Design a protein with these regions (language model features):
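Predominantly transmembrane beta-strands of Gram-negative outer membrane beta-barrel pores used
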Residues: 44-47, 60-66, 73-79, 98-106, ...
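Transmembrane beta-strand segments of Gram-negative outer membrane beta-barrel proteins
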Residues: 24-49, 67-84
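Outer-membrane beta-barrel porins/channels
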Residues: 23-37, 42-43, 105-492
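Strand-loop-strand
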Residues: 81, 90-91, 435-437
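Bacterial Sec-dependent N-terminal signal peptides
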Residues: 1-26, 488
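Asp/Glu-centered strand-loop micro-motifs enriched in Gly/Pro and often flanked by an aromatic residue
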Residues: 43-57, 87-89, 199-205
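Short secondary-structure boundary/capping segments within folded domains
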Residues: 34, 49-51, 57-58, 63-71, ...
Length: 492
């Protein structure tokens, strides 16, 4: 009877389609965060160019940084991203067009040196986030005590109190319509989980969040620099996962899940740079980024196998909604010594707990109100520190180094909340820790152009949970990856 109960409720989980919701705090922080990306020079110096400026990619962080230009510039960048392993049939390496932009300078022909010196206009495309990530994890801490089915049982029992059954995939069918489940029935239409000996999990994510910025900047007296950028964004995020659990009753069930999000959005970025001492190259910068306002579309589905036999599939309908990222604030410092050395430092802050979901018409439904409350409870402010330096032993050759620290957006003991009326059959989540990025690079200048190379290594560890149980110990995982990139540029 246990096997038949498992079969029927699992079928309910994946075969009943609905156009309900799939968003939560884990997806929210995923869409709001950024990689270190841009030109190879920008990456090699850790992105710490907010006060130094002079790079096409800086319009995405401090729009005033393009005001440092005195000649026009065009650049295009390519990279290879390497995660070291594949999953779900996807490779662990991808080639990518990461950046392409142009900056046009207009000399105001003001020989006095006072007042407006240059007005610069530019446009730049780059990848804000590359979602390439692969995971393969053996879960060996269940010990005949824990199971995903206990979490499902809790959802079932909650839903029974509301005269619904089916949980996770759909709650629109009456519990009296079907009398079965993957769980042991308690005799009063309630459910209890079945302990598991072990489990296996595999996941692959891919796609990108790309941005295109249009920038305008001003150089006033070679001492004050102002800039603004308008950014448009395009999200294409894909997730595929596989979960297999072997119960103490000898039965094995498999879920293969897929989830896709597409969306577009826009923001405005404002920046200012000042050289407070006219005779000194020291400068500081200030930036404000508005939230990015997105319109998103989600779709997801699942396949079910029981003891290696195909059972059923289910695809949930598309659902449109709106999503708003946090405000972001930044300060930066920069200094140069002659034409041979430059150093920059930058700090950014965004409060992840202020992210917000809503219906397409802006209405804050009960579901989204609950998700927004969960975001406030489980996420926190995120701090980013960037430092970078450049050394030129000769005019044509540059050596660069950089470092980033990005704090975790998760509060201690954060967990994924799955509504009994949501479409998820994915119960897994990872509380990712701090990010450390290390960068190196070199550049070669020649008449009319340049070639830059950069290497980036990103290290991050996390606590992985296949499902939520207060007593379940996490499995340690990592998201380490490396990137090699090249930029080809032209000055005119």
């Amino acid at each position: 009877m246990k096997r038949m109960n498992k079969y029927l409720l699992l079928t309910a989980l994946v075969s009943v389609a609905s156009a309900t919701y799939a968003q939560d705090s884990y997806d929210a922080q995923n869409f709001a965060n950024s990689d270190l990306n841009g030109t190879a020079r920008f990456v090699a110096m850790g992105g710490a160019l907010g006060a130094l400026g002079g790079d096409v990619s800086v319009m995405s962080t401090n729009p005033a940084g393009t005001g440092m230009y005195r000649s026009s510039d065009a650049a295009i960048s390519f990279s290879g991203l390497f995660t070291g392993k594949g999953a779900m049939g996807h490779d662990g390496a991808r080639m990518s067009l990461d950046q392409g932009g142009v900056l046009i300078t207009f000399d105001m022909d003001n020989p006095s040196g006072n007042g407006l010196q240059f007005v610069n206009f530019g446009a730049n495309y780059q990848k804000k986030r590359n979602y390439l990530f692969n995971q393969r994890t053996d879960i060996n801490n269940l010990g005949g005590i824990f199971s995903q089915t206990y979490q499902i049982a809790d959802l079932c029992n909650y839903s029974n109190a509301n005269n619904y059954w089916g949980t996770i995939a759909d709650m629109s069918a009456s519990k009296d319509g079907v009398h079965a489940g993957i769980l042991d029935e308690t005799g009063d239409y309630g459910y209890a989980g079945v302990a598991a000996d072990k489990a296996y999990f595999e996941k692959s994510t891919f796609g990108a969040n790309t941005q295109a910025d249009v920038n305008l900047s001003f150089n006033v007296s070679d001492q004050f620099f102002f800039g603004a950028s308008v950014g448009v964004y395009d999200i294409d995020y894909n997730r595929e996962s596989f979960y297999q659990e072997q119960g103490t009753d000898g039965n094995v069930y498999d879920f293969t899940n897929w989830y896709k999000t597409e969306g577009d959005g826009f923001d405005v970025k404002l920046g200012f740079i000042c050289r407070p001492i006219e005779e000194s190259p020291f400068r500081f910068g200030v930036t404000i980024h508005t939230p990015t306002w997105y319109r998103m579309t989600d779709a997801n589905g699942s396949d079910l196998f029981l003891n290696d036999a195909y059972v059923t599939s289910g695809n949930n309908g598309e659902y449109d909604y709106r999503f708003r990222t946090p405000w972001k604030f930044g300060v930066s410092l920069g200094h140069t010594i002659g034409n041979c050395f430059a150093i920059g430092a930058e700090y950014e802050f965004q409060d992840m707990s202020t992210m917000h979901y809503s219906e397409v018409d802006g209405y804050n439904s009960d579901y989204f109100r609950n998700q927004n409350n969960i975001i406030e409870q489980t996420l926190r402010g995120q701090h980013t520190l960037k430092v970078g330096a450049e050394f030129k032993p000769i005019e044509e050759l540059s050596f660069r180094v950089g470092y980033n620290f990005v704090s975790s957006p998760f509060k201690k003991d954060a967990y994924r909340t799955i509504g009994y009326d949501g479409p998820y059959t994915e119960t897994d989540y990872t509380n990712w820790g701090n990010i450390n990025r290390f960068t190196l690079g070199l550049g070669y200048r020649y008449k009319g152009g340049y070639v830059d190379l950069a290497w980036q290594y990103q290290a991050q560890k996390g606590d992985f949970y296949a499902f939520d149980d207060v007593n379940l110990q996490p499995t340690k995982v990592d998201a380490n990856r490396s990137q090699l990139m090249a930029t080809f540029g032209f000055r005119f």
